[in-house]
Amino acid sequence: MFDTIVPRGVDQLMALTQAFRKDDRTQKVDLIVGVYKDDTGGVPIMSAVKKAEAHLVAAETTKNYVGVIGDAEVNRIAPQLVLGENAPAIMDKRIGAVQTPGGSGALKVGFDLINSIRPGAKVWMSQPTWANHMPIARDAGMQIDSYPYFRESDRGLDFEAMMAHLDAEAVAGDVILLHACCHNPTGVDLAMPHWEALCKLIVARGLVPFVDSAYQGLGTSMEEDVAGLRHLAEHVPEMLIASSFSKNFGIYRERCGALTVIAKDEDSVPLIMAALQSVIRSNYSMPPSHGARIVGTVFGDAALKAEWAEELEVMRQRIAETRVLLRAKMEELQVTSDLSFLTDQRGMFSYTGFTSEQVNRLRDEFGVYTAGDGRINVAGVGSENIDYVASSFAAVMRSEH
């Protein structure tokens, strides 16, 4: 059987991470994978999470199955976090939600749902987008196309090209995948006027928005990071939202996410939920429980919730301050390139615009590992390595002039 297996490409981020671990140089920096790191380079467990876990260990009495749709509390919390507690779709009982194995699981379940209803449906993705978006959609049977998004010249948003392309090419029933905030890999987000204009196009064209909300709370605030998403939800008849608690709770390996589906009316929700359960049952059967119980415990305790919110804000501020400091240090090194992109972009990632030659030189000569497209995890920069990172970046940028 396996003699005929077709070779598949290795995930480049995972390959780079393995290469970093095998690199025996003492002076090396990991700016590859999107996990929050503290100033010392550690990937910490939030204090509120540790306290919630301690409570769970003491109170838990069973490891029984949780059911196909997962944890009821997460399925209540997730829609409220992204839409707001009194969102019209929630008040009108037009939503269905299922807990999933992380945000990736939510995306896969969402695409599987779409393909089960409309086989071979097309999904439009930003160019560029998260490296795993396309494989997930492809393996779910979706057709994939892309729309312009990132403008190389100023490392900013090319909104006019995005709108013109979608207006000319997208047709009714197509799905458009959007990033709620902290766009991965670019860090370039839509502002509210962009969301408003895009919403009008989506409604006029009859498109179905699928919003990936993986970094809520790490851009500007818990509320502002989903303001555009909420505007969409108030104006479109149908919508899907993939939520992840990996980043804003720091529970990456616990795999806790959720898929929220907004239906056109209350009567459609039971049909959607039945379809979701069918998709899930034949896939992973039911999601893991531990991460979901952590989230539910934190949100069920006012003191823990307040502590979590404070910790998340500290994380957000550290990322924002690191952007400012990294730019300042590079300007002190008299880098002549425009570095405003470092402070204009938001969230964990920055799209540096480094060429493949610069990326290779950073890795081979300086031991500074970035993604192959030049994306860096800003949270990987701390007080112990920021001078080295700045000087390494400056060295490869000067070589281009």
Predicted regions and their residues:
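N-terminal "arm"/small-domain region of PLP-dependent enzymes with the aminotransferase-like
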Residues: 1-70, 77-80, 282, 288, ...
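Hydrophobic beta-strand scaffold residues
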Residues: 31, 144, 209, 239, ...
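Structural signature of PLP-dependent enzymes
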Residues: 273-292, 298-327
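Short Gly/Ser/Thr- and Asp/Glu-enriched loop/turn motifs at secondary-structure junctions
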Residues: 93-94, 342-347, 371-374
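Conserved Walker B
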Residues: 213-214
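Active-site PLP attachment segment
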Residues: 228-271, 275
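Conserved PLP-binding catalytic core of the aspartate aminotransferase-like
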Residues: 309-365
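Conserved core of the PLP fold type I
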Residues: 55, 60-203, 217-218, 227-229, ...
